[in-house]
């Protein structure tokens, strides 16, 4: 997943040569099936977006994109753009629609895009982020009722990261009161999120960019090299096999109670808190080494059995 960092308030964006490099190198890894373009707002770099969608399709990958829909000014303009991105090879368009985006992008623009996508048979879905005080989606979707037929809609609680960390009061967040009784397994570590500075993380969650999970940087490694680093990262392996409860159980074992005294929006929020805690991560290093030894022992046993 290539994350364009283009919004009106930042000049940072991923160089096109990096994106071309990533797409070309993706052909060496069969498990990479889809290239996603996000942001920021990728449609602010429209011609580059069209070019990279074509590039992704030319090497046999699916192409998806996320947008706030600012460009659906009229139905004719929406139809023109939908036709162009579909012709370029876009497989799915995701729209961000909620009260936060609604302050800047009118419902009429979203309606134009949904109608145009329906006419061109371009698959589209909608994602919404809510807080306690910004959860009034009924008015928005009442206006989109007809256009929403056969359009999947996903709702997620706002995470306290980025601007939300400084601009949204903690009392407005929607917390999971039962987080510690859940399995907290992670099924999201199958994506590469690539940031404008080239840093790569194994997760597309806004809360996933923590140092222990960082895989590397596209300036330093090929995608194949990053994939090897992904497979050798012990924290990623544990998240996939055991989930966050491995860390919570370990915290309880060593008497590290800090995590149990806070509230969390969801497991992504909990994940961010755990992996951002340098003291805790330092204290559990010996246990990570033990896990490495267990994995290596299993590998040796498998080799012996194969003989």
Predicted features, each with a name:
Residues 1-17, 29:
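Canonical Radical SAM [4Fe-4S] cluster-binding loop centered on the CxxxCxxC motif
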Residues 3-5, 49-75:
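Mobile, glycine- and charge-enriched loop segments
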Residues 11-13, 42-47, 70-76, 101-106, ...:
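Acidic-and-aromatic substrate-binding clefts and catalytic sites of carbohydrate-active enzymes
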Residues 16-23, 75-85:
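Short, acidic/polar
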Residues 27, 50-58, 86, 114-118:
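Surface-exposed amphipathic alpha-helices with a cationic face
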Residues 31-34, 59-63, 89-91, 120-123:
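Short, well-ordered coil/turn segments that N-cap beta-strands
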Residues 83-92, 96-230, 279-281:
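Radical SAM enzyme [4Fe-4S]-AdoMet core and its adjacent flexible, acidic
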Residues 210-307:
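Flexible mid-to-C-terminal extensions adjoining Fe-S/redox cofactors in radical SAM and related proteins
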């Amino acid at each position: 997943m290539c994350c364009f960092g283009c919004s009106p308030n930042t000049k940072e964006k991923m160089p096109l040569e990096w994106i071309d490099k990533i797409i070309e190198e993706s052909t060496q890894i069969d498990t990479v099936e889809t290239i996603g373009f996000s942001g920021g707002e990728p449609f602010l770099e429209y011609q580059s977006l069209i070019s990279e969608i074509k590039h992704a399709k030319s090497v046999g990958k699916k192409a998806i994109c996320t947008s706030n829909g600012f460009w659906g000014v009229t139905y004719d303009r929406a139809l023109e753009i939908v036709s162009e991105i579909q012709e370029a090879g876009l497989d799915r368009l995701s729209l961000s629609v909620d009260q936060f985006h609604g302050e800047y992008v009118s419902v009429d623009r979203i309606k134009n895009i949904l109608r145009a996508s329906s006419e061109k048979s371009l698959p589209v879905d909608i994602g919404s982020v809510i807080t306690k005080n910004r959860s009034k989606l009924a008015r928005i979707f009442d206006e989109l009722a007809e256009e929403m037929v056969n359009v999947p809609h996903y709702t997620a609680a706002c995470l306290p990261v980025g601007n939300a960390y400084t601009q949204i009061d903690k009392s407005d967040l929607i917390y999971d009161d039962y987080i510690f009784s859940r399995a907290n397994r992670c099924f999201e570590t199958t994506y590469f999120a690539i940031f404008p500075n080239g840093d790569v993380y194994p997760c597309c969650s806004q809360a996933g960019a923590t140092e222990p999970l960082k895989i590397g940087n596209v300036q330093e490694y090929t995608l194949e090299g990053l994939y090897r680093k992904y497979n050798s990262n012990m924290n990623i392996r544990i998240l996939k096999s055991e989930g966050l409860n491995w860390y919570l159980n370990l915290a309880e074992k060593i008497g590290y109670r800090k995590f149990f005294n806070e509230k969390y929006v969801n497991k992504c929020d909990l994940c961010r808190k755990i992996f951002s805690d340098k003291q805790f991560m330092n204290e559990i290093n010996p246990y990570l080494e033990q896990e490495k030894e267990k994995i290596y022992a299993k590998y040796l046993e498998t080799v012996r059995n194969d003989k």
